[in-house]
Structures are given as C-alpha cells and as structure tokens.
C-alpha cells in the first residue's frame, strides 16, 4: 500500500518541507505577492511550506515582487520572488535581505545583445548581469540555449512539464541557472515564442498538438505549466462529466489521504477511510444525544460508505475554492484539514491567510496535544483555540 501511495504522488507537486516558512516560535511567515504570471505558483509553494498569504500589504508581511518591476524596485520595500524559489530549491529558509529589490547601481550598464546573431547558436558566454538581489537574470543566449535543448531533447509534451528533462539540462551546464528556474522560464516566458528567436516550432507530437489546442482554449491553465486532464473526444458530454467526477473523486480521496499523512505524520491503514467533512455553518458540533435517534445499523452503513451526493457536493465546493483562489487541489485540501473541515474558516484562511474568528489553524503538534489525557494541556488548547473550536476539532478527528 505504501508503494502504491508513492506511485500516486504528483511528480510535479511541491516536495519541500511543510514548515519551510514557519518561524522558530511556530508562527507562519506572511507574504504579499504582487499580481504577476507567477503568483499562482508562488502561492502554492508558500502555502505548502506553512506560510500564509495576505490580499493587501500588511504590517509584518514580506512583500514579494518580480525583479524588474519599477515601482517595487523604487520603493525598496520588496523582496524578489526568487527568494521563494531558492528557499524551495534548497529546502531551507534563506536570508531575506539578500533578495531585497532596489534601484540598479548608476554605474552599471547592461550589455547589449543581438538576438539575430544568437539564433544561429549560443555565443561564448560573457559575465551575466545580475539583479540587485544578487541573482543572475536570463539573457537571450540563455533563452536560445533552453529553447534549442527542449527542441532537440523533449520527446513529448509531458517531458516538458516533468522534471527529468530539466535536471538533465542542468547537469549539461547549459546555463548557470538551476533546473527549476530554467523550467519556470520556459513554461512561463518561452513556450510558444520560439519564432521570435528564429527557431522552429516546439517538438510536435499528437499529444503536444492536443495540449496546444487546450492551451488556446484555456491560456491561464497553459501559463501555469500544469498538464491538463485528458478528455476523450468521442465521449458524449454526459458520459464525460461522469468520468470527470469519478476521476476527481479519486483525486480528492487520494489527496486527502496524502495530506493527512503529511499533516499528521501517521501511518495510514491499508483501507484508508478518512473523508473530509465540510462544515457548512458555525453551529456547535452535534452531541451524542442529538445523534441518539440514529439506528446503529444506519451509523455503520454511513461510516462504511459516503453517499454520492455528499461526494459530489464536496468536490463541487473544493473546485469552487480552487477556481476562486487559483490554487491546486493539494493546497485546498490541506487548508480544509487545518481548519477542521469548516468551509467559512477555510475560505477565509485561503483568502487572507487567517481564520475569520481570529484563532490560529491547527498544527500537527496541536493534534498530538489534543490526544493527551491531560487537563492542563486541554486547558491550554481551549485558551489557544477557544472551547468551541476544540470541540469541533475533536468531532472532526472522530469522523
């Protein structure tokens, strides 16, 4: 079963520590990301690493912007988005000040490049211009080298969105950038722009043609660099919807099990039956007395199998949150788990980085403390989360 779970993981999903952006005192680092094509990916990496996001610039939040943004560099208050990518790449928290954006030195003049000359081949490398944060920027030579390598070595569209091609590119010392940076550069800036460098089209295959047509229909999804779900062209619309629901149902269950394992670091049984229970309101959780009228047989039946309407409703809600906040399935399900399955609290957390009631989200250590038969520990949890939220958490874990 463990092997099956490993095989089921998304190879392109975040793999860095879930506490990468958590301070030593246990509080989460808060980030504000300026609108940009990379915002979705950065948000996913930040939330996966235990950080939080704010919709507006708040005191104490780390302000992120892409190098080259004039307003951000002029203010001197922004940190380069490369900080997130480098932290994730090294899986360690780096020094923020090393990535602070600011006006370029007056004496520095960027060397001029001629794309027409580079199109025939990559010229001898000159010292690369560096951003104020100390990170090398991509030159035209880098772009041509990346496009040429992809054209010659990518066997299919999936190899471009995977990791193996880019790791091999890094080992070949094609550029001085990391494979993550080159992959991000190609997917966000270079793919579909080959003609500007006087190069041929990207590798053509039936699958890449389908991906291209899909990208034309959904450009936002194409920018994300994420492979789209395959759609069987000959299936009637109704059958396709059923197939899609079935695929998403399996994905939701798989991601919840995966999220639970990462969040709680516990061993999952061979027949994992952990289901997310989305609380639609903030009323007190049901008490045993309120459930006493339910027959034992019915309870066992409900525990053994979740009804199709319930699954459909859960999938619909998760989809809505994914679309509303432009996040992936893993991030949304993690947020539900950390907020005891409460819809309002989860939505608020995804939007602002904190719950509407002002209480913190649940961590693995909090859940471990919750299992202790210790009155002092329980009182501390009540003080931290409030009696109502503690009761909800207990009920949520039972389910």
Curated annotation (Swiss-Prot):
CDD domains to which the protein is assigned, alphabetical: rap1_myb-like
A GO molecular function held by the record: G-rich strand telomeric DNA binding
Entry's localization field: Nucleus; Cytoplasm; Chromosome; Chromosome, Telomere
Gene Ontology biological-process annotations: intracellular signal transduction; negative regulation of DNA recombination at telomere; negative regulation of telomere maintenance; positive regulation of canonical NF-kappaB signal transduction; positive regulation of NF-kappaB transcription factor activity; positive regulation of non-canonical NF-kappaB signal transduction; protection from non-homologous end joining at telomere; protein localization to chromosome, telomeric region
GO cellular component, one term: cytoplasm
Pfam family, one: Rap1_C
Modified residues (N-acetylalanine): 2
Domain Myb-like: 130-190
Domain BRCT: from-to ranges: 10-101
Region (Disordered): 1-21, 199-245, 279-309
Subunit structure: Associates with the I-kappa-B-kinase (IKK) core complex, composed of CHUK, IKBKB and IKBKG. Homodimer. Component of the shelterin complex (telosome) composed of TERF1, TERF2, TINF2, TERF2IP ACD and POT1. Interacts with TERF2 (but not TERF1) with its C-terminus. Interacts with SLX4/BTBD12. Interacts with TERF2; the interaction is direct.
Protein's name according to its UniProt entry: Telomeric repeat-binding factor 2-interacting protein 1
Organism taxonomic ancestry: Eukaryota, Metazoa, Chordata, Craniata, Vertebrata
């Amino acid at each position: 079963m463990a092997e099956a779970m490993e095989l089921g993981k998304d190879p392109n999903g975040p793999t860095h520590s879930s506490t990468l952006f958590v301070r030593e005192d246990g509080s989460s680092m808060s980030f504000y990301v300026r609108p940009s094509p990379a915002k979705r990916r950065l948000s996913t990496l930040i939330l996966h690493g235990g950080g939080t996001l704010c919709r507006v610039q708040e005191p104490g939040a780390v302000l992120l912007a892409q190098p080259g943004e004039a307003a951000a560099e002029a203010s001197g208050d922004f940190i380069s988005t490369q900080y997130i990518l480098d932290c994730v790449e090294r899986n360690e928290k780096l020094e923020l000040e090393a990535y602070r954006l600011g006006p370029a030195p007056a004496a520095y003049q960027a060397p001029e490049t001629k794309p027409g000359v580079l199109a025939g081949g990559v010229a001898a490398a000159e010292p690369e211009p560096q951003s104020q944060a100390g990170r090398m920027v991509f030159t035209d030579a880098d772009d041509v080298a990346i496009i040429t390598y992809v054209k010659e070595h990518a066997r299919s569209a999936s190899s471009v969105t995977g990791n193996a091609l880019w790791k091999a590119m890094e080992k070949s010392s094609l550029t001085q950038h990391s494979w993550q940076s080159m992959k991000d550069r190609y997917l966000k800036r270079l793919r579909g722009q080959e003609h500007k460098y006087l190069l041929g089209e990207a590798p053509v295959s039936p699958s890449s043609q389908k991906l291209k047509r899909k990208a034309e229909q959904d450009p936002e999804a194409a920018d994300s660099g994420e492979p789209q779900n395959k759609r069987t062209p000959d299936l009637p619309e109704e059958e396709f919807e059923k197939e899609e629901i079935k695929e998403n149902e399996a994905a939701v269950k798989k991601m919840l099990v995966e999220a639970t394992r990462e969040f709680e670091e516990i061993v999952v049984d061979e027949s994992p039956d952990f289901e997310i229970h989305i609380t639609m309101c903030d009323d007190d959780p049901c008490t045993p007395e309120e459930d006493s009228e339910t027959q034992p047989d019915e309870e066992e039946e409900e525990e053994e199998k979740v009804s199709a309407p319930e699954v459909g409703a859960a999938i619909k809600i998760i989809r809505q949150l994914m679309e509303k906040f432009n996040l992936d399935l893993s991030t949304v399900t993690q947020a539900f788990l950390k907020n005891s399955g409460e819809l309002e609290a989860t939505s608020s957390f995804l939007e602002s980085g904190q719950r509407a009631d002002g209480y913190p989200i649940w961590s693995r250590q909090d859940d471990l403390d919750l299992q202790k038969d210790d009155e002092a520990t329980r009182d501390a949890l009540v003080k931290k989360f409030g009696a109502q939220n503690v009761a909800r958490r207990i009920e949520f874990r039972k389910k």
